[in-house]
Amino acid sequence: MKERKLLWQGLVALALIPCVLLIYLTGRRVRLPYADEMESAARLHGQVVAAVKAERLRRGYELVPEDRLALGLMGNQISAITTSLGSEEAKRTSQLSDFAALAVRYLHEAGVRPGDRIGACFSASFPGVDLAVLCAAEIMGLDIEYSVSIGSSNYGANLPGYVLPEMILTANRAGLLSTLPQLITMGGDGDAGENMMAYMLEDEEDIREIEEMQARLNEEGLFLTHYSQGFEADVLDRMARMGDIAAFVNVGGNILGMGDTDAAVNFGQGLMAPADPRIGPKSGLVERYLSLGVPVIHLLNIKQLCAETGIPYDPVTLPEPGISGVYYHRDYSRLAIGLVFAGAAIAILAIQLLSRQKREA
Protein backbone atom coordinates (compact mmCIF):
# COMPACT_ATOMS: atom_id res chain seq x y z
CA MET A 1 0.00 0.00 0.00
CA LYS A 2 2.85 2.34 0.88
CA GLU A 3 4.49 1.63 -2.46
CA ARG A 4 1.24 2.43 -4.31
CA LYS A 5 0.93 5.73 -2.42
CA LEU A 6 4.50 6.66 -3.32
CA LEU A 7 3.77 5.77 -6.94
CA TRP A 8 0.75 8.08 -7.00
CA GLN A 9 2.74 10.88 -5.39
CA GLY A 10 5.46 10.42 -7.99
CA LEU A 11 2.91 10.59 -10.80
CA VAL A 12 1.45 13.80 -9.37
CA ALA A 13 4.92 15.32 -9.13
CA LEU A 14 5.64 14.36 -12.75
CA ALA A 15 2.32 15.83 -13.86
CA LEU A 16 3.15 19.11 -12.14
CA ILE A 17 6.36 19.57 -14.14
CA PRO A 18 4.64 20.37 -17.46
CA CYS A 19 2.11 22.48 -15.54
CA VAL A 20 4.87 24.63 -14.07
CA LEU A 21 6.46 24.82 -17.52
CA LEU A 22 3.10 25.96 -18.88
CA ILE A 23 2.97 28.77 -16.32
CA TYR A 24 6.43 29.93 -17.38
CA LEU A 25 5.64 29.76 -21.10
CA THR A 26 2.39 31.69 -20.69
CA GLY A 27 4.23 34.44 -18.80
CA ARG A 28 4.53 37.78 -20.59
CA ARG A 29 7.56 40.07 -20.62
CA VAL A 30 6.20 43.39 -19.34
CA ARG A 31 8.08 46.68 -19.42
CA LEU A 32 8.60 48.11 -15.94
CA PRO A 33 6.51 51.19 -15.05
CA TYR A 34 9.69 53.27 -14.56
CA ALA A 35 11.47 51.89 -17.65
CA ASP A 36 11.41 55.30 -19.37
CA GLU A 37 13.33 56.73 -16.42
CA MET A 38 15.75 53.80 -16.62
CA GLU A 39 16.28 54.47 -20.31
CA SER A 40 16.91 58.17 -19.65
CA ALA A 41 19.59 57.25 -17.11
CA ALA A 42 21.18 54.86 -19.60
CA ARG A 43 21.27 57.54 -22.31
CA LEU A 44 22.80 60.03 -19.88
CA HIS A 45 25.39 57.39 -18.99
CA GLY A 46 26.26 57.08 -22.67
CA GLN A 47 26.90 60.83 -22.82
CA VAL A 48 29.02 60.74 -19.67
CA VAL A 49 31.11 57.84 -20.95
CA ALA A 50 31.65 59.62 -24.27
CA ALA A 51 32.87 62.76 -22.45
CA VAL A 52 35.22 60.70 -20.27
CA LYS A 53 36.58 58.84 -23.28
CA ALA A 54 37.30 62.10 -25.11
CA GLU A 55 39.16 63.52 -22.10
CA ARG A 56 41.10 60.29 -21.65
CA LEU A 57 42.28 60.44 -25.26
CA ARG A 58 43.11 64.13 -24.89
CA ARG A 59 45.38 63.23 -21.97
CA GLY A 60 47.26 60.78 -24.15
CA TYR A 61 45.81 57.48 -22.93
CA GLU A 62 44.92 55.22 -25.85
CA LEU A 63 42.20 52.60 -25.39
CA VAL A 64 43.46 49.24 -24.18
CA PRO A 65 43.16 46.26 -26.59
CA GLU A 66 40.89 44.47 -24.11
CA ASP A 67 38.26 47.21 -24.51
CA ARG A 68 36.49 45.53 -27.45
CA LEU A 69 33.50 47.85 -27.17
CA ALA A 70 35.80 50.89 -27.35
CA LEU A 71 33.94 52.68 -24.56
CA GLY A 72 37.09 54.01 -22.93
CA LEU A 73 36.58 53.25 -19.24
CA MET A 74 38.91 50.25 -19.01
CA GLY A 75 42.35 50.88 -17.60
CA ASN A 76 45.54 48.86 -17.85
CA GLN A 77 46.04 45.39 -16.50
CA ILE A 78 48.64 46.76 -14.08
CA SER A 79 49.64 50.29 -13.14
CA ALA A 80 51.15 52.21 -10.25
CA ILE A 81 47.75 52.43 -8.51
CA THR A 82 46.56 48.86 -9.16
CA THR A 83 45.64 47.20 -5.87
CA SER A 84 44.22 43.76 -6.66
CA LEU A 85 43.13 41.25 -9.28
CA GLY A 86 40.08 41.84 -11.46
CA SER A 87 38.26 40.04 -14.25
CA GLU A 88 38.73 41.42 -17.76
CA GLU A 89 35.25 40.24 -18.81
CA ALA A 90 33.59 41.79 -15.76
CA LYS A 91 35.36 45.10 -16.27
CA ARG A 92 34.40 45.16 -19.94
CA THR A 93 30.76 44.44 -19.06
CA SER A 94 30.64 47.01 -16.25
CA GLN A 95 31.00 49.81 -18.81
CA LEU A 96 27.49 49.15 -20.19
CA SER A 97 24.84 51.84 -19.80
CA ASP A 98 22.39 49.14 -18.73
CA PHE A 99 23.90 49.51 -15.26
CA ALA A 100 22.46 53.03 -15.04
CA ALA A 101 19.07 51.50 -15.83
CA LEU A 102 19.68 48.84 -13.18
CA ALA A 103 20.55 51.49 -10.59
CA VAL A 104 17.24 53.27 -11.27
CA ARG A 105 15.40 49.95 -10.96
CA TYR A 106 17.03 49.04 -7.64
CA LEU A 107 16.46 52.52 -6.21
CA HIS A 108 12.77 52.34 -7.10
CA GLU A 109 12.53 48.86 -5.58
CA ALA A 110 14.19 50.24 -2.44
CA GLY A 111 11.42 52.82 -2.15
CA VAL A 112 13.57 55.86 -2.97
CA ARG A 113 11.64 58.89 -4.22
CA PRO A 114 12.60 62.19 -5.92
CA GLY A 115 14.25 64.57 -3.48
CA ASP A 116 15.46 61.78 -1.17
CA ARG A 117 19.05 61.68 -0.02
CA ILE A 118 21.07 58.55 -0.68
CA GLY A 119 24.62 57.63 0.29
CA ALA A 120 27.21 55.80 -1.77
CA CYS A 121 30.71 54.40 -1.55
CA PHE A 122 32.48 54.03 -4.91
CA SER A 123 35.57 52.00 -5.73
CA ALA A 124 37.56 52.93 -8.84
CA SER A 125 37.55 49.26 -9.85
CA PHE A 126 34.18 49.77 -11.60
CA PRO A 127 34.09 53.33 -12.95
CA GLY A 128 31.24 52.48 -15.33
CA VAL A 129 29.02 51.36 -12.46
CA ASP A 130 30.03 54.35 -10.31
CA LEU A 131 29.01 56.69 -13.12
CA ALA A 132 25.84 54.65 -13.63
CA VAL A 133 24.70 55.28 -10.05
CA LEU A 134 25.43 59.00 -10.43
CA CYS A 135 23.39 59.08 -13.66
CA ALA A 136 20.51 57.32 -11.90
CA ALA A 137 20.61 59.86 -9.07
CA GLU A 138 20.69 62.71 -11.61
CA ILE A 139 17.66 61.45 -13.54
CA MET A 140 15.67 60.60 -10.40
CA GLY A 141 16.34 63.98 -8.80
CA LEU A 142 18.15 62.58 -5.76
CA ASP A 143 20.54 64.21 -3.33
CA ILE A 144 23.57 61.90 -3.34
CA GLU A 145 26.37 62.11 -0.77
CA TYR A 146 29.21 59.86 -1.80
CA SER A 147 32.87 58.99 -1.48
CA VAL A 148 35.27 57.69 -4.12
CA SER A 149 38.51 55.79 -3.76
CA ILE A 150 41.37 55.86 -6.24
CA GLY A 151 42.98 52.43 -5.99
CA SER A 152 41.65 49.94 -8.54
CA SER A 153 41.88 46.30 -9.50
CA ASN A 154 43.00 45.22 -12.99
CA TYR A 155 41.37 47.08 -15.89
CA GLY A 156 39.54 49.55 -13.65
CA ALA A 157 40.15 53.30 -13.44
CA ASN A 158 43.84 52.74 -12.77
CA LEU A 159 45.43 55.34 -15.06
CA PRO A 160 47.39 57.64 -12.70
CA GLY A 161 47.03 60.52 -15.15
CA TYR A 162 43.23 60.30 -15.20
CA VAL A 163 41.60 58.83 -12.10
CA LEU A 164 37.96 58.34 -11.07
CA PRO A 165 37.43 61.73 -9.33
CA GLU A 166 38.68 63.43 -12.50
CA MET A 167 36.26 61.40 -14.64
CA ILE A 168 33.41 62.69 -12.49
CA LEU A 169 34.82 66.22 -12.74
CA THR A 170 34.87 65.88 -16.54
CA ALA A 171 31.16 64.99 -16.55
CA ASN A 172 30.44 67.80 -14.10
CA ARG A 173 32.18 70.41 -16.25
CA ALA A 174 30.28 69.11 -19.28
CA GLY A 175 27.02 69.82 -17.45
CA LEU A 176 26.08 66.14 -17.27
CA LEU A 177 26.51 65.40 -13.54
CA SER A 178 25.79 67.97 -10.85
CA THR A 179 27.32 66.42 -7.72
CA LEU A 180 31.05 66.02 -7.05
CA PRO A 181 32.37 63.55 -4.46
CA GLN A 182 32.10 64.56 -0.84
CA LEU A 183 35.17 62.56 0.06
CA ILE A 184 38.15 61.15 -1.87
CA THR A 185 40.50 58.52 -0.45
CA MET A 186 43.35 56.45 -1.82
CA GLY A 187 41.49 53.15 -1.43
CA GLY A 188 43.21 49.79 -1.15
CA ASP A 189 44.51 48.47 2.17
CA GLY A 190 43.73 50.79 5.03
CA ASP A 191 41.89 53.00 2.51
CA ALA A 192 45.33 54.58 2.18
CA GLY A 193 46.67 52.82 -0.92
CA GLU A 194 49.06 50.65 1.09
CA ASN A 195 48.85 47.78 -1.40
CA MET A 196 49.18 49.85 -4.58
CA MET A 197 51.73 48.29 -6.91
CA ALA A 198 54.02 51.32 -6.68
CA TYR A 199 54.38 50.88 -2.92
CA MET A 200 54.43 47.07 -2.97
CA LEU A 201 57.29 47.05 -5.50
CA GLU A 202 58.92 50.16 -4.01
CA ASP A 203 59.16 51.55 -7.52
CA GLU A 204 60.44 55.13 -7.21
CA GLU A 205 59.18 56.18 -10.64
CA ASP A 206 55.68 54.86 -9.96
CA ILE A 207 55.65 56.43 -6.49
CA ARG A 208 56.58 59.74 -8.07
CA GLU A 209 53.67 59.26 -10.50
CA ILE A 210 51.30 58.87 -7.54
CA GLU A 211 52.70 62.01 -5.90
CA GLU A 212 52.14 63.93 -9.14
CA MET A 213 48.57 62.60 -9.25
CA GLN A 214 47.92 63.78 -5.69
CA ALA A 215 49.29 67.26 -6.46
CA ARG A 216 47.18 67.47 -9.63
CA LEU A 217 44.01 66.50 -7.76
CA ASN A 218 44.63 69.23 -5.19
CA GLU A 219 45.06 71.78 -7.99
CA GLU A 220 41.71 70.66 -9.44
CA GLY A 221 39.99 71.09 -6.07
CA LEU A 222 39.67 67.33 -5.60
CA PHE A 223 41.23 67.07 -2.16
CA LEU A 224 42.31 63.73 -0.75
CA THR A 225 41.30 62.71 2.76
CA HIS A 226 43.81 60.65 4.73
CA TYR A 227 42.11 58.77 7.54
CA SER A 228 44.07 58.08 10.70
CA GLN A 229 41.45 57.64 13.43
CA GLY A 230 41.23 53.86 13.21
CA PHE A 231 38.92 51.70 11.12
CA GLU A 232 35.73 51.91 13.19
CA ALA A 233 36.06 55.66 13.73
CA ASP A 234 36.65 56.16 10.01
CA VAL A 235 33.48 54.21 9.13
CA LEU A 236 31.41 56.16 11.65
CA ASP A 237 32.83 59.43 10.31
CA ARG A 238 31.78 58.40 6.80
CA MET A 239 28.25 57.69 8.03
CA ALA A 240 28.07 61.04 9.82
CA ARG A 241 29.08 62.83 6.61
CA MET A 242 26.27 61.13 4.67
CA GLY A 243 23.64 61.92 7.30
CA ASP A 244 20.13 60.46 7.19
CA ILE A 245 19.76 58.54 3.94
CA ALA A 246 16.92 56.67 2.24
CA ALA A 247 19.28 54.05 0.78
CA PHE A 248 22.97 53.18 0.60
CA VAL A 249 24.78 52.03 -2.55
CA ASN A 250 28.12 50.25 -2.43
CA VAL A 251 30.07 49.74 -5.67
CA GLY A 252 33.12 47.50 -5.63
CA GLY A 253 35.16 46.32 -2.69
CA ASN A 254 36.35 49.44 -0.87
CA ILE A 255 37.37 48.41 2.64
CA LEU A 256 35.17 50.96 4.42
CA GLY A 257 32.18 49.79 2.39
CA MET A 258 32.75 46.07 2.75
CA GLY A 259 34.35 46.06 6.17
CA ASP A 260 37.61 44.56 7.33
CA THR A 261 36.12 41.04 7.37
CA ASP A 262 34.46 38.73 4.85
CA ALA A 263 31.02 39.04 6.48
CA ALA A 264 29.49 41.45 3.94
CA VAL A 265 30.12 38.98 1.10
CA ASN A 266 27.51 36.65 2.60
CA PHE A 267 24.65 39.14 2.21
CA GLY A 268 24.43 38.79 -1.58
CA GLN A 269 24.29 41.22 -4.49
CA GLY A 270 21.94 43.85 -5.81
CA LEU A 271 19.17 45.11 -3.54
CA MET A 272 19.94 43.17 -0.40
CA ALA A 273 17.33 41.37 1.64
CA PRO A 274 16.77 42.82 5.13
CA ALA A 275 19.28 41.41 7.58
CA ASP A 276 20.44 41.95 11.13
CA PRO A 277 24.20 41.40 11.07
CA ARG A 278 26.23 41.35 14.24
CA ILE A 279 28.11 44.66 14.29
CA GLY A 280 31.70 44.75 15.47
CA PRO A 281 34.69 47.10 15.26
CA LYS A 282 35.56 45.80 11.77
CA SER A 283 32.06 46.07 10.29
CA GLY A 284 31.81 48.27 7.21
CA LEU A 285 29.10 50.49 5.79
CA VAL A 286 27.15 47.64 4.14
CA GLU A 287 26.67 45.77 7.42
CA ARG A 288 26.01 48.88 9.48
CA TYR A 289 23.31 50.23 7.20
CA LEU A 290 21.68 46.80 7.00
CA SER A 291 21.60 46.70 10.79
CA LEU A 292 19.85 50.10 10.83
CA GLY A 293 17.17 48.92 8.40
CA VAL A 294 18.40 51.19 5.59
CA PRO A 295 18.00 49.59 2.12
CA VAL A 296 21.42 48.57 0.78
CA ILE A 297 22.29 48.10 -2.90
CA HIS A 298 25.55 46.20 -3.36
CA LEU A 299 27.14 46.12 -6.83
CA LEU A 300 30.28 43.99 -6.99
CA ASN A 301 29.79 40.60 -8.65
CA ILE A 302 29.10 41.76 -12.21
CA LYS A 303 28.53 38.28 -13.64
CA GLN A 304 25.96 37.42 -10.98
CA LEU A 305 24.19 40.76 -11.37
CA CYS A 306 23.91 40.19 -15.13
CA ALA A 307 22.54 36.68 -14.66
CA GLU A 308 19.91 37.92 -12.20
CA THR A 309 18.77 41.03 -14.07
CA GLY A 310 19.02 40.28 -17.80
CA ILE A 311 21.96 42.54 -18.59
CA PRO A 312 24.12 40.84 -21.27
CA TYR A 313 27.44 39.63 -19.89
CA ASP A 314 30.50 40.47 -21.99
CA PRO A 315 28.51 41.15 -25.19
CA VAL A 316 30.23 41.34 -28.57
CA THR A 317 28.24 44.43 -29.59
CA LEU A 318 26.97 47.35 -27.54
CA PRO A 319 23.29 46.90 -26.54
CA GLU A 320 20.93 49.81 -27.16
CA PRO A 321 19.23 51.36 -24.10
CA GLY A 322 15.77 49.96 -23.42
CA ILE A 323 16.32 46.55 -25.02
CA SER A 324 17.79 44.16 -22.46
CA GLY A 325 15.92 42.18 -19.83
CA VAL A 326 16.71 44.65 -17.04
CA TYR A 327 13.88 46.89 -18.32
CA TYR A 328 11.27 44.15 -17.97
CA HIS A 329 9.68 41.79 -15.50
CA ARG A 330 7.77 38.61 -16.23
CA ASP A 331 4.01 38.64 -15.62
CA TYR A 332 2.48 35.20 -15.16
CA SER A 333 -1.11 34.17 -15.87
CA ARG A 334 -3.05 34.06 -12.61
CA LEU A 335 -5.54 31.69 -14.23
CA ALA A 336 -2.79 29.21 -15.14
CA ILE A 337 -1.30 29.41 -11.64
CA GLY A 338 -4.73 28.90 -10.09
CA LEU A 339 -5.47 25.87 -12.28
CA VAL A 340 -2.13 24.26 -11.43
CA PHE A 341 -2.61 24.70 -7.69
CA ALA A 342 -6.21 23.53 -7.91
CA GLY A 343 -5.14 20.47 -9.88
CA ALA A 344 -2.40 19.69 -7.38
CA ALA A 345 -4.80 20.05 -4.46
CA ILE A 346 -7.38 17.77 -6.12
CA ALA A 347 -4.71 15.16 -6.88
CA ILE A 348 -3.43 15.19 -3.30
CA LEU A 349 -6.94 14.88 -1.90
CA ALA A 350 -7.64 12.00 -4.31
CA ILE A 351 -4.52 10.16 -3.14
CA GLN A 352 -5.50 10.63 0.50
CA LEU A 353 -9.06 9.43 -0.23
CA LEU A 354 -7.84 6.34 -2.08
CA SER A 355 -5.40 5.54 0.70
CA ARG A 356 -8.14 5.84 3.32
CA GLN A 357 -10.48 3.60 1.30
CA LYS A 358 -7.75 0.97 0.97
CA ARG A 359 -7.15 1.01 4.73
CA GLU A 360 -10.89 0.70 5.49
CA ALA A 361 -11.23 -2.17 3.00
Regions found by a protein language model. Give the residues of each.
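Membrane-interface motif at the C-terminal end of an N-terminal transmembrane signal
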Residues: 19-34, 351-357
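A substrate-binding/cap region within the structured catalytic cores of diverse enzymes
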Residues: 162-248
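N-terminal, Lys/Arg-enriched amphipathic/low-complexity engagement segments
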Residues: 39-96
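Short Gly/Thr/Asp-enriched flexible loops that form oxyanion-binding sites at enzyme active sites
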Residues: 129-136, 259-267
